[in-house]
Amino acid sequence: MLAEDFIREARSAQPELPPPQLLQLVAYQEALPENAEGDDQNAVFRASVLKALSKNFSQEDRPLIRFLLEQEIVFHENSWGIFESIRLCGALLFLLAQAGDVGLLWEAKTANFDTMSGFDIQLLVGAGVTQTLAYLQQVEEEWAEDARIYLEECQQAGDFQNLECYREGLRASLR
């Protein structure tokens, strides 16, 4: 199946996620030991779906993008390094600008040592710094407090001063 065909089939199920038999094509699947491709049998196809999706996406694609990010998080929790696919998921959710995605984006940021340094903190505040911090203030969970404190420190350090330039740069990179 081609990535474009996968997206077309996935969109036919909107606003719900596609059926499990379709999702299994992009779900994290631990690779067999002799597989030289990496730790995830579906990583390459998932990356091609993300690349194709990034050319034309909307709010209706958000459940699928979130699912893809969940798979990338599991992949990164079980591997070293950071791959472009997790960054691309983050970029798409950043551009969709929903404060409710910050929890999943925080999971991506903290998936491993390399994502902590290589997954841009700006990706967590697509809805805006104030809106994201207000959302986190309402969530009574430990991760939310950790994320809020980290974001406040980043705000004080000036990491969000050029957020609109960052947004425009992401948009331009997807064209």
Residue positions per predicted region:
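Long, helix-rich interaction regions
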Residues: 1-15, 81, 102-175
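Amphipathic alpha-helical scaffolding segments comprising HEAT/armadillo-like alpha-solenoid repeats
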Residues: 2-4, 16-35, 59-76, 98-110
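Alpha-helical repeat scaffolds in large eukaryotic proteins
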Residues: 11, 48-58, 69-73, 94, ...
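Extended aliphatic helical segments
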Residues: 26, 43-44, 49, 74, ...
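Structural detector for internal amphipathic alpha-helices that build alpha-solenoid repeat scaffolds
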Residues: 44-56, 79-96, 118-127
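Compositionally biased, low-hydrophobicity segments enriched in charged and small polar residues
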Residues: 59-92, 130-136, 142-143
